[in-house]
Amino acid sequence: MIVRNLGDIRKTDRNVRSDGWASARMLLKDDGMGFSFHVTTLFAGSELRMHYQNHLEAVLVLKGTGTIEDLATGEVHALRPGVMYALDDHDRHIVRPETDILTACVFNPPVTGREVHDESGAYPADPELAREPVAAD
């Protein structure tokens, strides 16, 4: 059994911060669960262009508001508490938080914990290609 406390995780190197977001990685590849689980905050006013070419992601919004735009269709969906979106086709998208948005996310395959988005908006497929994260405050 794995039991972890979010407050404790936020004080470790499992708490990764990058432009527009901070992510507490609660479960990682080394935990052997077959997925990773993150509690991520998307910062108000940011525009997060992402394209997970090597991972599938599902996200549940817990707090905050904003929008997500599907770049293939142009559709824009409202984000608010209780809304879930799943990037089941490696969807290119932009998240625009109006307020800080708190989310719970799962990734398959699991991330190692070091990943931050590359220039294409993806996490690298090979963990050895992952850049070192910027420490969170």
From Swiss-Prot:
Swiss-Prot/TrEMBL GO biological process terms: ectoine biosynthetic process
UniProt cross-references to InterPro entries, sorted A to Z: Ectoine_synth (IPR010462), RmlC-like_jellyroll (IPR014710), RmlC_Cupin_sf (IPR011051)
EC number: 4.2.1.108
One Pfam family in the UniProt entry: Ectoine_synth
UniProt region (Disordered), positions on chain: 115-137
UniProt KW keywords: Lyase
Catalytic class of the enzyme: lyase
Keyword Membrane: no
Entry GO MF terms: ectoine synthase activity
Catalytically driven reaction(s): (2S)-4-acetamido-2-aminobutanoate = L-ectoine + H2O
Functional pathway: Amine and polyamine biosynthesis; ectoine biosynthesis; L-ectoine from L-aspartate 4-semialdehyde: step 3/3
NCBIfam families assigned: PRK13290.1 (NF009806)
Similarity field: Belongs to the ectoine synthase family.
Role played: Catalyzes the circularization of gamma-N-acetyl-alpha,gamma-diaminobutyric acid (ADABA) to ectoine (1,4,5,6-tetrahydro-2-methyl-4-pyrimidine carboxylic acid), which is an excellent osmoprotectant.
Protein name in the entry: L-ectoine synthase
Source species: Sphingopyxis alaskensis (strain DSM 13593 / LMG 18877 / RB2256) (Sphingomonas alaskensis)
Annotated gene: ectC
